[in-house]
């Protein structure tokens, strides 16, 4: 992620995660805020906005100046949230420009919470186990893969439960 606190302030709170290739920035005198348990997906751009507690901004979405993403709301991947838009709590917004599609279900909110928790666990595990290594010259045969509780995209989870 590129966290540009050079002009405006960045405020990323406890339990929040900002994933690979995100950009956070703000104009001078403004700030970008990601509240507790906020989840910012890969490639998202936040510029001078506020992401409230437990909200999720999907991959490659853009949230522009003075927009507010409500508590436990979800911005779909690739959405464009215009300046000054107020996204209501517990809603799904999508599109270019983003518009409110519907309220989120309890199942969807539980899925989001599980995803955020998995990123917190990744941080703990990384601090505990990362060490300097020498790059491999060839793939290791039968290399062990990471073992995590089943964490699936929501669509795959729903299909499995159907």
Tell what function each PLM region has:
Residues 1-7:
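N-terminal first-folded block
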Residues 6, 20-21, 26-27, 31-34, ...:
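Glycine-rich hexapeptide-repeat left-handed beta-helix
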Residues 9-11:
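Surface-exposed loop/turn motifs in large extracellular/passenger domains
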Residues 14, 36:
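A cytosolic small-molecule/anion-sensing beta-strand core signal
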């Amino acid at each position: 992620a590129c966290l540009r606190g050079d002009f405006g302030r960045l405020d990323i709170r406890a339990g929040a995660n900002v994933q690979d290739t995100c950009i956070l920035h703000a104009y001078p005198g403004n700030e970008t805020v990601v509240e507790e348990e906020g989840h910012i997906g890969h490639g998202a751009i936040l510029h001078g906005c506020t992401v409230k507690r437990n909200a999720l901004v999907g991959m490659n979405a853009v949230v522009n100046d003075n927009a507010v993403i409500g508590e436990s709301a979800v911005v779909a991947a690739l959405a464009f949230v215009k300046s000054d838009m107020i996204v209501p709590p517990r809603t799904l917004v999508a599109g270019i420009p983003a518009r409110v599609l519907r309220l989120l279900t309890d199942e969807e909110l539980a899925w989001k919470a599980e995803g955020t928790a998995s990123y917190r666990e990744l941080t703990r595990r990384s601090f505990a186990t990362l060490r300097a290594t020498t790059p491999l010259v060839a793939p290791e045969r039968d290399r062990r893969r990471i073992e995590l509780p089943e964490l699936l995209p929501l669509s795959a989870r729903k299909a499995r439960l159907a």
